[in-house]
A protein has these predicted regions:
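Helix-loop-helix junctions that connect adjacent transmembrane segments
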Residues: 1-20
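Helix-boundary and loop/linker segments of multi-pass membrane transporters
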Residues: 2-4, 137-142
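Helix-loop junctions at the membrane interface of multi-pass solute transporters
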Residues: 14-40, 44-49, 60-65
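Membrane-helix boundary/coupling elements in multi-pass transport proteins
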Residues: 16-35, 95-126, 145-167
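Extracellular/periplasmic helix-exit of transmembrane alpha-helices
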Residues: 50-129
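Membrane-interface interhelical connector segments
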Residues: 131-136
Length: 167
């Protein structure tokens, strides 16, 4: 997390998604079911790349709505920031990303979890970002928790079916 221009990172993110789309085409067990003729492969491949690029852009948008302090709270190991919200907030603030323990506790409560500290990996971080976006579209007291858990479920099902189809 740093401040700076979106260029070239937006294009790197889109290219990553496009490459993943290509990998989905060549390794997926569902691709042969979509192909009636060899000439259809190019369109299916490009469609996969475009959809993967869209997913990459959505991930970038979800990451950009997160406060950097929350991002570091979620992605830093417990050994570095502590399991205590007050100590974690102090460590993250000392890193240069001001945040207070009340914000960490409030965010955890909003998403229906006991804590958001040390939730390493992209899935929880993306889920919190998507929950922020979606709860703005459909407001409500419990909607943040709903969208957070929906995003986690969607990610898990998407990944599991992609792995299943690709193996």
């Amino acid at each position: 997390v740093f401040s700076g221009a979106l260029f070239p990172f937006l294009f790197i993110t889109i290219a990553c998604g496009a490459v993943s789309g290509f990998h989905a085409l060549i390794s997926s067990g569902t691709t042969p079911k979509m192909v009636e003729n060899e000439t259809h492969v190019r369109m299916i491949g490009y469609g996969g790349m475009i959809m993967e690029s869209f997913v990459a852009i959505m991930a970038l948008a979800a990451a950009s709505v997160l406060d950097p302090g929350i991002y570091f709270a979620m992605n830093s190991p417990t050994a570095l920031i502590s399991a205590d919200a007050v100590q974690a907030a102090q460590v993250i603030t000392d890193m240069g990303f001001p945040i207070d323990s009340a914000t960490l506790l409030h965010t955890a409560k909003e998403v229906g979890e006991n804590t958001i500290l040390s939730r390493a990996g992209g899935a929880p971080t993306l889920a919190v970002g998507m929950a922020h976006i979606m709860s703005q579209l459909i407001p409500g007291e419990a909607m943040m928790a709903f969208w957070y858990h929906f995003a986690l479920l969607f990610e898990a099902l998407f990944i599991l079916t992609a792995v299943d189809a690709g193996t």
